[in-house]
Amino acid sequence: MLLLLAEYLQQFHKGFAVFQYLTLRGILGVLTALSLALWLGPWMIRTLQIRQIGQAVRNDGPQSHLSKSGTPTMGGALILSAIAISTLLWADLTNRYVWVVLIVTLAFGAIGWVDDYRKVIEKNSRGLPSRWKYFWQSVFGLAAAIFLYKTAPTSVETTLIIPMLKDLAIPLGAGFIVLTYFVIVGSSNAVNLTDGLDGLAIMPTVMVGGALGIFCYLSGNVKFAEYLLIPYVPGAGELIVFCGALIGAGLGFLWFNTYPAQVFMGDVGALALGAALGTIAVIVRQEVVLFIMGGVFVMETLSVVIQVASFKLTGKRVFRMAPIHHHFELKGWPEPRVIVRFWIITVILVLIGLATLKLR
């Protein structure tokens, strides 16, 4: 929005041309979203408290979690508001990738909002039934996949790239739709499973989102893409503004979500942020790198799959409780220790993901 205004004002003063720079608008995206989250956060927390929109805590979980009962939830609406406003202000609104990521993020946020609403407001412990949740996730995930497939100008944008094997490119054809669906929906649910401790999900999301922003910037620049042997995706660089907004909104939310949390993001935030990461990774053809950098999300998801499969097949549980962060809590790890160690793991994995840029 402001980019269009700056382009108009260039005829009066050339200084407004500075807003053409992606890096500047990415930084402004961070600062705008961060400011909005910090400004609106206290008001949202008070509103949630007044409306008694509080988190219910499982009785079979760690006893330390009982004190969290009643903590305001659905704070993900704060994150999504800050991301949306910042992106609409600073991004090029003629760029199709910006709209795809933004719409997918808000659509999955809407699914999470309905789920949270039924749990908290309607006092329905099941929330949105799983079959309906996955149905709507599938609808929006497939819609995004089909749109990206149908509008791809070159086969590069539907080719699977393997890090460290950059000479190997696997044309997916219509299989791109299937892969994209699983990446978006899988990433959405993986972040949601991770969101069980104060700040546990949001900081890895911020770090992975920041790294994906770097991939977006490099993939959108033909010279960098050719030098690094990564897919050149025209227009992908504009997503650095969205990634910047995600970083700012995430850090602003973490200000209130850090241990002991004043607010939880709820499904409205977790499902949306996971879907955003998955969609961005698909656009820049870095699904495998997302799998690496989001290793904490993958680990949390696998722990649930293993736990359920083991119990159904043998009647025994592999972990004391799943997702795996609860397993470590029940082993006696204090909550802050689990959180920070998972953050450290994410830092290492993100660095490995970024290192694939130079590995041939």
Curated annotation (Swiss-Prot):
Assigned keywords, A-Z: Cell cycle, Cell division, Cell inner membrane, Cell membrane, Cell shape, Cell wall biogenesis/degradation, Magnesium, Membrane, Metal-binding, Peptidoglycan synthesis, Transferase, Transmembrane, Transmembrane helix
Compartment list: Cell inner membrane
Predominant place of localization: membrane
ATP-binding as UniProt keyword: no
Substrates-to-products reaction catalysed: UDP-N-acetyl-alpha-D-muramoyl-L-alanyl-gamma-D-glutamyl-meso-2,6-diaminopimeloyl-D-alanyl-D-alanine + di-trans,octa-cis-undecaprenyl phosphate = di-trans,octa-cis-undecaprenyl diphospho-N-acetyl-alpha-D-muramoyl-L-alanyl-D-glutamyl-meso-2,6-diaminopimeloyl-D-alanyl-D-alanine + UMP
Pfam families: Glycos_transf_4, MraY_sig1
InterPro entries given in the database record: Glycosyl_transferase_4, PNAcMuramoyl-5peptid_Trfase, PNAcMuramoyl-5peptid_Trfase_CS
Membrane topology designation: Multi-pass membrane protein
GO cellular component: plasma membrane
Cofactor: Mg(2+)
GO biological process terms held by the UniProt record: cell division; cell wall organization; peptidoglycan biosynthetic process; regulation of cell shape
Domain of life: Bacteria
GO MF annotation, one: phospho-N-acetylmuramoyl-pentapeptide-transferase activity
PANTHER family, sorted: PHOSPHO-N-ACETYLMURAMOYL-PENTAPEPTIDE-TRANSFERASE, PHOSPHO-N-ACETYLMURAMOYL-PENTAPEPTIDE-TRANSFERASE HOMOLOG
Job description of the protein: Catalyzes the initial step of the lipid cycle reactions in the biosynthesis of the cell wall peptidoglycan: transfers peptidoglycan precursor phospho-MurNAc-pentapeptide from UDP-MurNAc-pentapeptide onto the lipid carrier undecaprenyl phosphate, yielding undecaprenyl-pyrophosphoryl-MurNAc-pentapeptide, known as lipid I.
Family per similarity comment: Belongs to the glycosyltransferase 4 family. MraY subfamily.
The name this protein goes by in its record: Phospho-N-acetylmuramoyl-pentapeptide-transferase
Lineage: Bacteria, Pseudomonadati, Pseudomonadota, Gammaproteobacteria, Pseudomonadales
